[in-house]
A protein has these predicted regions:
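Catalytic grooves of carbohydrate-active enzymes
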Residues: 217
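N-terminal basic/disordered segments at the start of proteins
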Residues: 1-6
């Protein structure tokens, strides 16, 4: 876990680029290799699928990999929560990953399946010393409030997850307090302003989060490098949201807009 959550400050900046496993090509991540290359230097770890790891990450780069191993559904299917484990522990070892990631859907039709998936994955990982990150995915019918997220995070930890990724909410400190393993926050959908995403990161850390696993709010920004630098200044540099936003604005004045933004116009 020390490769995921830095022991110097017990925090992490994880870059999420696993969205294609259910969303397909997405603005900002249409060409994963291009997106990842520009941001790699500023992330503590990458969360991605084995397909993107094989095709889009330079194997010479030494960065901790959080491998998404749950899937089997898509945005056009009937129920995103009907996920299975889609990669073996042997494959994870071959790919030299640092951590395994899997979604759970507490309260959904497939709650039992995804929770037993988590238990099985923890058992698989324990045999080889590979920790597991549980993602508390939220279905359309579920509220992102502290009661629900606190329940989901606690269950994930009780099932053996070593770290939990969840959403920020009101009374988030209660969610963290009730979870005996580190909690990192998801960035979620792209917010309208970079300042909002930076405030989200800052508030979560103030309420006890151990870091962020952010994707769309970084690589869907017109200035993704400046954005990840600003996020990093909050997580590891103890900047507040205003200081981080000023750093973002300064960087965006000299950063060339991302190619995906140019292509889409």
């Amino acid at each position: 876990m020390s490769r995921i959550i830095k022991p110097e400050d017990s925090r992490c900046v994880m870059l999420a680029v696993d969205h294609g496993y259910f969303l397909g090509p997405t603005d900002g991540l249409r060409v994963p290799r291009r997106t990842i290359k520009s941001l790699l230097h500023y992330a503590d770890s990458l969360m991605l699928t084995r397909g993107v790891l094989r095709t889009s990450v330079n194997p010479a780069v030494n960065i901790p990999i959080v491998l998404r191993v749950s899937g089997g559904t898509s945005i056009v299917g009937e129920d995103l929560s009907n996920e299975s484990i889609v990669a073996s522990i042997e494959e994870a070892i071959r790919l030299n990953v640092t951590c395994l990631a899997l979604s759970i859907f507490v309260g959904s039709k497939y709650e039992h399946k995804t929770l037993t998936n988590l238990s099985k994955l923890v058992d698989m990982g324990e045999k080889f010393g590979i920790p597991v990150l549980a993602v508390t995915a939220v279905g359309k019918e579920m509220n992102r409030d502290s009661r629900y997220l606190g329940l989901a995070c606690r269950i994930a930890a009780e099932m053996g997850a070593h770290v939990v990724k969840t959403y920020y909410c009101d009374n988030f400190a209660e969610v963290v307090e009730g979870c005996p393993v580190p909690v990192i926050i998801a960035g979620g959908k792209k917010l309208s302003q970079e300042s909002e995403a930076l405030r989200l990161a800052y508030d979560a850390l103030q309420d006890g989060a151990s870091g962020v696993d952010m994707g769309r709010n970084i690589w869907q920004s017109n200035h993704p490098v400046s954005m990840i630098k600003a996020v990093r200044s909050i997580v590891h540099g103890n900047a507040n949201e205003q200081e981080a936003y000023e750093e973002f604005l300064k960087g965006s004045q000299i950063e060339t807009p991302k190619e995906d933004t140019i292509d889409s116009k």
